[in-house]
Amino acid sequence: MKYKRIVFKVGTSSLTNEDGSLSRSKVKDITQQLAMLHEAGHELILVSSGAIAAGFGALGFKKRPTKIADKQASAAVGQGLLLEEYTTNLLLRQIVSAQILLTQDDFVDKRRYKNAHQALSVLLNRGAIPIINENDSVVIDELKVGDNDTLSAQVAAMVQADLLVFLTDVDGLYTGNPNSDPRAKRLERIETINCEIIDMAGGAGSSNGTGGMLTKIKAATIATESGVPVYICSSLKSDSMIEAAEETEDGSYFVAQEKGLRTQKQWLAFYAQSQGSIWVDKGAAEALSQHGKSLLLSGIVEAEGVFSYGDIVTVFDKESGKSLGKGRVQFGASALEDMLRSQKAKGVLIYRDDWISITPEIQLLFTEF
């Protein structure tokens, strides 16, 4: 079995009727495929949108609401209804499911990150299928484009999944918009996510969901940089999940980096919030970015911000102004300032094990398109 642990992300457009309401037949089809894969020995996590779709009708809305408060209220009602659909269908096959609601804070805060990881590990080891969604009823930012796309990549990286599958209404990444460009061709295998790939991702998408192709590509960066390959395929075929697990489904496959980031490096790269800035000379910049060395005090030109021992800072090349990466400091700002002022600074500010270089691929995650 090539892909034992698989994270599936199902978007709103793959769960709804034409009027935007939840399609029970589509939910049933998804759970049947999950059951078949589970019975075949796969460990599965489902990141599912659809809470708003499941709830807005129960609150008397004629169509999917657009106001934040209405969305939150609909999500609060719909989350339970959506989980009930999944749970009922899975129990028919004697499979236990579990609801986990996450927010970005569960990844930023290291203690909460550890707790979430431990809970997911126990559930998978016990044969349950975790069903994950963002906590849409309380988190405003997470209702924006890309919410569960990013979440699924973060979860896949956290549990060191063997594969992340995006099920959507578009069967992969195209060179153009397949809905309007007859010359558009699907890319079957993507070795590296770069600016050209990002440009291609501005095309096809659906009006019902909040996740477009661009957010899936940026989410794929998180996964592939963490060592998890990604597959984007259509949810319209009845056996798409099974075929994706067997690599027989048509779609776009994103190759994982051979040396994926371990958990500590993932946290530094994608979640750790910087408390200050450090500018270094050319020698220190080369030592960090090209030779994998620690950052010595002697290579620091200046520092900015209020930070303490153990905080995360961003390091810049003074000459080019380029961001080099992030790391955990061994001295607070005031102590560092005193040492730099003495002009006899010796020692290490950031050890290489507490450092992550910002690759061009990771840098794309922090670029607005």
Swiss-Prot record:
The keyword Nucleotide-binding applies. Residues 275-355 form the PUA domain. SUPFAM superfamilies: Carbamate kinase-like, PUA domain-like. The keyword Ubl conjugation does not apply. Pathway: Amino-acid biosynthesis; L-proline biosynthesis; L-glutamate 5-semialdehyde from L-glutamate: step 1/2. GO terms for molecular function: ATP binding; glutamate 5-kinase activity; RNA binding. It is an enzyme of class 2 (transferase). NCBIfam families: proB. This is Glutamate 5-kinase.
